[in-house]
Amino acid sequence: MTDNVNPNVKEGWTGPGRRDGTILPMKPEDDALHIDVGAKNQFEWWYFDATLEGGYTLVAFFYAAYPNPGLDTGKIAVELTLLRPDGTKTQKVIKYKKSQFFASKEEPHVTIGSNTMKATFTEDGFSIYEIFLEDEDLMFELTYKAQVKGWMPGDGYSYFANLGYFAWVVPLPRASVTGHIRDGDKMLDVSGVGYHDHNWLDFSFQSIIEYWMWGRVYSENYSVAYAFIQCNEKVDRHAVKVLMGAKGSEIFLSSGEYEFTQEDFVYSEVAGHSYPQSITINVPGELEIKLDVAKVLEQVNMLDNFNPVLAFLAKNVLRLKPGYFRLKSDFTLKATRDQLETVETGSTSHEVVTFKQLGARE
């Protein structure tokens, strides 16, 4: 499959081509605040997740400006989601006033109400993040210790002609996670593996982007983070592709030059969208990953989160159809290093966010 490439879309790779011959080191300010909080069409958020022993998965957001379409667009907020081993979920979005928000522009330090995120850095360049989020139903108090140093594709930015920019940095491609959580009135000591990234942009998602798919793969020896972002006709359906590969703590691959194949779409009545049961990511001669969906963890028609009037306008006037999937897949990873091929397997979760119908509706 040949990529659509618009020469007016500028990606921040150091080269040659759409990859990093030199991987730029992350600095503390890369994970600090970038936008003018409250300004129109400026969005920024810090994302954390963790897969915990015992079968729990959690997700936490700190929003300087909430990016999703709806009445909360642009609001300061935090979000807590807990997926339990039995498949049940609690998800809370709590909004705050600007007077309750602080974020440094020099280092990773965010306070929203009583919710906090702060990082420290060791002499060897590995970071430690402490996060705390709480409402009446959920509480997360966690420490993330980096196992792979922070990474960004090129300088982290993609510029979409004169339409705006999108920035993505990954301060914690892979981290050990310890701490405790509260689920209702039940306290749990937890440990597991986690991830943290950070995004900011100056346009509304749906104005340029049709869909994106992203995730991570953690095997015994390798860590991979990827994103495939399909843009619309405004930029000639340009596809932004980013991928990081690390062996142990060493990042050996930072590239947008990979083949991305989606197959065997299945329609979800709940989400009103289809998702691919199989995804293959291939960097010829270097890395290949096959994802086969074993379970749908979340499937959401995002119009269900709108009030009825706004949902009608979004669907029938703006022609928006936002949907979301969190998928659990079995993976096979093949890595070639120094002419030696290694094969490792496991399971992982990955996500799909879309504003158009994917695949064929059956």
Question: Can you describe what each PLM-predicted range is?
Answer:
Residues M1-E362:
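Structured soluble/peripheral alpha/beta segments that form catalytic or ligand/cofactor-binding pockets
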